[in-house]
Amino acid sequence: MARFEEQKLYIGGRYVEASSGATFETINPANGEVLAKVQRASREDVERAVQSAVEGQKVWAAMTAMQRSRILRRAVDILRERNDELAALETLDTGKPLAETRSVDIVTGADVLEYYAGLVPAIEGEQIPLRETSFVYTRREPLGVVAGIGAWNYPVQIALWKSAPALAAGNAMIFKPSEVTPLTTLKLAEIYTEAGVPDGVFNVLTGSGREVGQWLTEHPLIEKISFTGGTSTGKKVMASASSSSLKEVTMELGGKSPLIIFPDADLDRAADIAVMANFFSSGQVCTNGTRVFIHRSQQARFEAKVLERVQRIRLGDPQDENTNFGPLVSFPHMESVLGYIESGKAQKARLLCGGERVTDGAFGNGAYVAPTVFTDCSDDMTIVREEIFGPVMSILVYDDEDEAIRRANDTEYGLAAGVVTQDLARAHRAIHRLEAGICWINTWGESPAEMPVGGYKQSGVGRENGLTTLAHYTRIKSVQVELGDYASVF
């Protein structure tokens, strides 16, 4: 029997029954427990959501900027009041440790919503003088109805990262969470309604990407798609969005990010960064620094320091507040990660630790994989080329700076990169040469609301967070005014 009641769709400011009558299950990856049956949206439900969003958006856009700002700030307050409740639900659905979801997932999502709530009154156009009797002014107008398609690793945070700028700019959003982790996004919809967001401005449709996601990308009344997920799926979403009605897109896609540790680096700091960049959230972070480049002269010392820190990882029940490493998000994903680990062994990478499923006692009921470190890796290995999205670190040895940067850039991805060094000139020189949209010097992983995040190459299109993102949820209307006579040539 499921722990929670059957989960409905959220359309027009309330829960509604899916017309399909079909459901799917969401599972606690820590123990295999069925958390809930979740209703599967149909094409008819997509139409209902779009019509509701069209109507709600008109009401929302007609409000003053200060009115919208106050309502979004109210939603921020509710999110923070309900932080622990939402964190507990996120932990059940994702398997993330409670200590992590309490301090990161809802907190960082609320921060982004607060940031954009403050920017609502600052959305403004320009006045451009042409001559004494004529000028141009511009208006930034909302796009209308936009759609967000989320990933399973940060469900509520991603929903907030996408909905915050969209709603701040006066749009309505239809959001499709991942089938794997749909629960907290439905709670976010409740919170928006409680805060005073008009009915229809934020709708949640649960179901598969192949169906619901496809219907959203094809719909002619949806003006923009914001997608987070794998690169192969992102290409399909982008193609569908373009071929249907030339929709705007934001794509936050895969990564295989390099972390370069230079010979002068503080190795204790470097090891701390490398372990965080690979094992936080059980390695299920798109920006993880999974290709760790270490200078040959420092390899043995660095590996020893990494192993020392891995031994301190507290793998356990996510509900235990002392746990800082939980299961993977699902059993199918666990099998995928284990497959990559076997590939690393077969291709003769040297295994330093981990490399297996954890099955001791109660862990045998969950999707646990031990923190895994491979060394003596080569650039052509599958574990080095492909995104694993799990707790697997690959250590690669290099001999000089040019080699490290050339190899770091030898990838189809360009999401993130980082360097560890005490030489300020070298740090900036290297970062300027690395082909990645998000870079860190002597740190890793923080993505504050003010910071635009997104990738180069096949890691994405557009940005999330920061000032630049808000502009991409608006369109510019240019208006010329003539105060003098009009001279016709006819």
UniProtKB/Swiss-Prot annotation:
Pathway: Amine and polyamine biosynthesis; betaine biosynthesis via choline pathway; betaine from betaine aldehyde: step 1/1. Keywords: Metal-binding, NAD, NADP, Oxidation, Oxidoreductase, Potassium. It holds the Pfam family Aldedh. K(+) 1 binds at T26, I27, D93, V180. The keyword Metal-binding applies. NAD(+) binds at G150, A151, W152, K176, P177, S178, E179, G230, T231, S232, T233, G254, C286, E387. It catalyses: betaine aldehyde + NAD(+) + H2O = glycine betaine + NADH + 2 H(+). The active site is at K162 (charge relay system), E252 (proton acceptor), C286 (nucleophile), E464 (charge relay system). One of its GO terms (biological process) is glycine betaine biosynthetic process from choline. The modification Cysteine sulfenic acid (-SOH) is found at C286. SUPFAM superfamilies: ALDH-like. It is an enzyme of class 1 (oxidoreductase). It comes from the Bacteria. The record marks E248 as: Seems to be a necessary countercharge to the potassium cations. K(+) 2 binds at L246, K457, G460. Belongs to the aldehyde dehydrogenase family. This is Betaine aldehyde dehydrogenase. The lineage of its organism: Bacteria, Pseudomonadati, Pseudomonadota, Gammaproteobacteria, Pseudomonadales.
